[in-house]
Each structure stands twice: as C-alpha cells, then as structure tokens.
C-alpha cells in the first residue's frame, strides 16, 4: 500500500514559489541569506504542509511575486553569466532555465495526475 501524501495543487504552487526564489534570487542574484517562502531548515517540506496555509489567494500572490522577482534577477544577464551552486560548482543562467523547464514539466505532470484523480479524464 502507498502511504498518505501531502501532494496537492496548492502545494505545487507553493513549491514553485520556493524554486523560483532559490534559483533566481538566492543563487543567481547572490541573495544567499534570503529566507524561504514556506520552508525552513526545520521543515524542509513546508511548501507542501497545508496544515496552516496562509490561504490560496496569498499563495498565488506569493508565486506571482517570486516569478516577477525572478524575471528581474535575470533581466539584462547573458545566458553565460555564472554563479556558484551551494556546493561551489560554477553554473550559468542557461542551466537555470533548463532546470526550470524540468521543474515545471515534472510538477505539471504531478498536477495532471491529481486532476485525473478528481475528474477521471485522461489525455489523448
């Protein structure tokens, strides 16, 4: 049997707010001490913990804000602009964009599975 999961559509939105912040602001823009949106060192999966959510509207606004701030962090930069990963490995903006495509593709797939469980409709 599969155990319970905290995966939810709202959790995915919250998670992507964290991901946008982590790669564009904390890594690319060098704001390493910028805190988390929902997570913490104590609760690394806080983005999926909906026991005390701020509310869906606030979560969607937070996601939108992080996307706008990510756009601002990347504005005017070359795809070859480099930064250091947490481990100190040099990386570039091109890598972030490719990674974000992977992140969104993966989590859109998760969202599709959740939607299918609700409405039973499958794709072509």
Where are the language model's segments positioned?
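Short, contiguous alpha-helical
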Residues: 1-45, 85-124
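Acidic/histidine-rich alpha-helical segments that form the ligand environment
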Residues: 44-84, 94-100
């Amino acid at each position: 049997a599969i155990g319970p999961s905290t995966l939810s559509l709202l959790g995915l939105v919250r998670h992507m707010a964290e991901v946008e912040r982590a790669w564009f602001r904390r890594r690319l823009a060098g704001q390493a001490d910028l805190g988390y949106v929902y997570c913490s060192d104590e609760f690394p999966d806080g983005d999926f913990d909906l026991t005390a959510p701020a509310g869906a509207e606030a979560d969607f606004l937070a996601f939108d804000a992080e996307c706008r701030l990510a756009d601002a962090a990347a504005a005017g930069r070359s795809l070859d602009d480099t930064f250091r990963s947490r481990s100190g490995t040099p990386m570039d903006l091109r890598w972030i964009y490719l990674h974000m495509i992977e992140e969104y593709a993966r989590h859109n797939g998760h969202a599709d599975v959740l939607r299918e469980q609700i409405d039973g409709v499958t794709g072509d």
